A protein has these predicted regions:
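Helical "lid/coupling" subdomains associated with nucleotide-phosphate turnover
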Residues: 36-39, 53-56, 72, 76-105, ...
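N-terminal basic/disordered segments at the start of proteins
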Residues: 34-62
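Short acidic/polar active-site loop segments enriched in Thr and Asp
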Residues: 47, 108, 332
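Broad gene-expression machinery/nucleic-acid interaction feature
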Residues: 48, 66, 166, 173-177, ...
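N-terminal glycine-rich anion-binding loops that anchor highly charged ligand groups
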Residues: 60-72
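A short acidic Gly-Thr/Ser loop motif
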Residues: 43-48, 169-175, 254-257, 340
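Non-catalytic pre-domain segments flanking phosphatase-related domains
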Residues: 1-38
Length: 363
């Protein structure tokens, strides 16, 4: 059974369709998608290794194949400032699978990125050199602003166009990015022009759980996690005081934390992306779901079909980050995104190639 947010593999040309910045007018009927160029995006984070293949489709893209594996590359990095040998070996094994899948497909273009674990580790560059030697994959370390932009680009379609703003957040393994997006006044759907402010904090589900503990999390420990994250975000929130005071914005989250919350809220027994991606949760439902998770023992979290053993020690740290965001940016609505960096990478490559301005990018 695939557990929410921890599924290893998804195959199928119709698994999911993501809207992009291409034109909306005209019929989306077109030629067979197999004639469209194929793109690949790989995101190596502190906790996960994720690969996505997609083709242009209408004004967006359609996923052909996806691969995701929890590797915990950043395990212990908050204490040692280094990637451990065990974590490196786990990650390289996953990257070998990615390399094999990429080699088996004729790609128009690909982009492979590494984020916080490789940014902050003293041996991050040495690790990527080893990855190149052992897998043939060349990964680039992206800075925090680029990571925030990519997450926003991947989720932009889920922002409510009727609100004055959106607080978009990506809760990662080693860091979390929060972006204020203004309303789209131009119709160009350009991420950078809408980013009024952004911040990246050094707290993700791995780093926060390693600092405070993720197995036995008392309510006092949970409150400490929330307060630590809130303190990091306070000054950022103050710069947006005029926007916050209007209340005319909503939250938009992308991460295993929010997809897990959505699954628990809906009572899912297995992963159903079509029910999670784009799901709206009200403030009371979020609070009730988090309260239920905080009240569980580690064993209860580990055996819950929406969490599983691989995330049982991380999910409460993610909830604490979300609660800190909610304290500073109170909103009646949260929209959940099962998309993010990889989709942002794919949209960027396709946009640069002008695929949505060419004839024949059919549905």
């Amino acid at each position: 059974m695939n557990r929410l947010g921890t599924s290893d593999e998804i195959d199928g040309a119709t698994e999911k369709r993501i809207a992009g910045p291409g034109p909306r007018k005209g019929s989306e009927q077109g030629p067979d998608l197999r004639h469209q160029p194929l793109y690949a995006a790989l995101d190596l984070g502190t906790n996960n290794c994720r690969l996505l293949f997609a083709r242009p489709s209408g004004h967006g893209l359609r996923v052909v194949e996806a691969f995701s594996r929890i590797v915990r590359l950043g395990e212990g990095i908050s204490r040692s400032n280094q990637l451990s040998e065990n974590a490196i070996r786990r990650t390289i094994e996953a990257l070998k699978i990615c390399a094999s899948r990429m080699a088996a497909r004729p790609l128009q273009q690909s982009r492979l990125i590494a984020t916080e674990a490789c940014r902050s580790a003293s041996n991050g560059e040495a690790f990527l050199a080893r990855v190149l030697e052992e897998t043939g994959l060349s990964l680039e370390i992206v800075d925090r602003e680029t990571e925030a932009q990519l997450a926003a680009a991947g989720c932009l379609e889920l922002a409510d166009p009727h609100e004055d703003g959106v607080v978009l957040f990506d809760i990662g393994g080693g860091s979390s990015e929060i972006v204020w997006l203004d309303r789209d006044e131009t119709g160009q759907r350009d991420v950078r022009s809408r980013m009024r402010a952004w911040i990246s904090i050094p707290w993700g589900v791995v780093t926060l759980s390693e600092r405070h503990g993720g197995i036995e999390v008392t309510r006092e420990v949970y409150r400490s996690m929330v307060e630590e994250v809130r303190a990091h975000l306070h000054d950022f929130a103050e710069t947006l005081a005029p926007q916050r005071q209007t209340g005319r914005y909503h939250l938009l989250g992308t991460s295993g934390t929010v997809t897990t919350l959505g699954g628990v809220h809906l009572g899912l027994r297995r992963y159903e992306r079509r029910r999670i991606d784009g799901l709206w949760m009200g403030d009371e439902a979020i609070s009730a779901t988090i309260e239920a998770l905080v009240g569980m023992t580690y064993r209860q979290r580990a055996t819950h079909p929406c969490i599983g053993h691989q995330r049982a020690d991380l999910v409460l740290a993610g909830c604490a980050i979300l609660d800190a965001i909610r304290l500073l940016f109170p909103s009646e609505r949260l929209r959940i995104a099962d998309r993010g960096l990889r989709e942002g990478l794919l949209i960027g490559m396709m946009k640069a190639d002008g695929v949505w301005h060419k004839k024949g990018s059919g549905a």
